[in-house]
């Protein structure tokens, strides 16, 4: 268990990085990237992360200093209460921040019901603390109260950067000034500034890693999405008859505490296989932190994933990857030529087959060439530094 920091450490400006959802290793990777980004702009900054699940998995990112989530610090409606030690000074810690950064990810989507965070963002603005929305996916919102809250926070934000093109239009429609909305890309790409290099002592990459989920697919019933995941696993096994397949996810191991737990989907998919097929499948159990996910994916010759961040981790290390996701967030890869391996119609058997065939062939493009192909996305991700540098913290 990780104890939270007691308050602001030495340094200036005071930057509070909010909204990290550490149950998802993709969000944990973003937290690492944002921490580095802030310190690259303000080398003497005091940085605290008001993140979720730090008490459970914060040890996976020991270089980050955590405090309770910002909605708990501010005591907004719907938030879990902050620990007793914070009851009297959570708001003061936020008030003493010179900048609050809402770190990128995909939580600003109506189906996630992020109401406490929306209340917290408005309260940050009302306290007079500059608020930066950094590297977000922003969806459409229909609920009148949510729209009103977003109009207040986005309209008053010191900066708004989004990671995909549809989010630009959504942010503007929700009140952000068009001239202030910057299209960037996923912040986790900043963790891979250099091309992959082969380590002489490292074993050759082998086997295929598969990430299954029913949370990032096209609309439909949970049963339909679970069947699609099982079908995808079977299709991979058919194509790699003499290789082992490893199942893991960047969102697993915490059960209901993490809201989404792909371990359940993976387990159900395995039960649909024949006994012979099951013997070829290895399952990674428990929570997988960002570094463990990055290292595990790098050991495989190919990756097939229904989640975005495993694809970004693998591609950034030169691992041929099929990304089968129907969501706005895949726009982080706009301008990157992945061919059929970027499959935005995962329910289409032909499109799915083309994606698998593209990356499971022995001569699939990989290594430095694949890393270089990500240059457009990495370049957009780097714009987030300019976004931060253009903010004048309230010091």
Each model region followed by its residue ranges:
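Active-site anion-handling motifs in enzyme catalytic cores
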Residues: 1-395
């Amino acid at each position: 268990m990780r104890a939270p920091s007691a308050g602001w450490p030495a340094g200036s400006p005071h930057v509070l990085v909010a909204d990290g959802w550490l149950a998802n290793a993709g969000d944990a990777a973003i937290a690492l990237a944002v921490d580095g980004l802030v310190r690259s702009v303000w080398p003497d900054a005091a940085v605290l992360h008001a993140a979720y699940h730090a008490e459970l998995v914060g040890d996976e990112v020991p270089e980050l200093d955590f405090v309770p989530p910002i909605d708990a610090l501010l005591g907004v409606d719907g938030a879990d209460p902050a620990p007793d030690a914070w009851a009297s000074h959570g708001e003061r810690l936020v008030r003493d921040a010179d900048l609050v950064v809402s770190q990128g990810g995909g939580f600003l989507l109506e189906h996630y019901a992020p109401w406490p965070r929306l209340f917290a963002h408005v309260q940050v603005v009302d306290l007079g603390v500059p608020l930066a929305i950094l590297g977000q996916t922003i969806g459409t919102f229909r609920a009148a109260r949510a729209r009103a809250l977003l109009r207040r926070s986005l309209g008053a934000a010191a900066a708004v950067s989004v990671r995909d093109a549809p989010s630009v239009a959504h942010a503007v429609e929700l009140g952000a000034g068009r001239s202030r909305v910057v299209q960037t890309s996923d912040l986790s790409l900043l963790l891979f500034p250099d091309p992959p290099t082969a380590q002489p002592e490292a074993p050759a990459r082998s086997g295929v890693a598969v990430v299954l989920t029913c949370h990032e697919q096209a609309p439909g019933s949970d049963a339909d999405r679970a069947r699609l995941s099982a079908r995808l696993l079977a299709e991979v096994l058919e194509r790699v008859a003499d290789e082992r397949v490893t199942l893991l996810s960047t969102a697993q191991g915490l059960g209901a505490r993490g809201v989404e737990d792909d371990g359940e989907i993976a387990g159900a998919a395995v039960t649909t296989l024949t006994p012979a097929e099951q013997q070829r499948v290895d399952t990674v159990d428990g929570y997988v932190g960002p570094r463990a996910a990055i290292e595990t994916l790098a050991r495989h010759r190919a990756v097939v994933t229904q989640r975005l961040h495993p694809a970004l981790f693998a591609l950034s290390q030169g691992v041929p990857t099929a990304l089968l996701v129907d969501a706005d967030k895949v726009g982080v890869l706009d301008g990157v030529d992945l061919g059929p391996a970027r499959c935005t119609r995962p329910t289409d058997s032909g499109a799915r087959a083309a994606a698998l065939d593209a990356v499971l062939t022995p001569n699939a493009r990989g290594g430095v060439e694949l890393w270089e192909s990500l240059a457009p996305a990495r370049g957009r991700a780097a714009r987030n530094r300019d976004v931060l540098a253009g903010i004048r913290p309230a010091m």
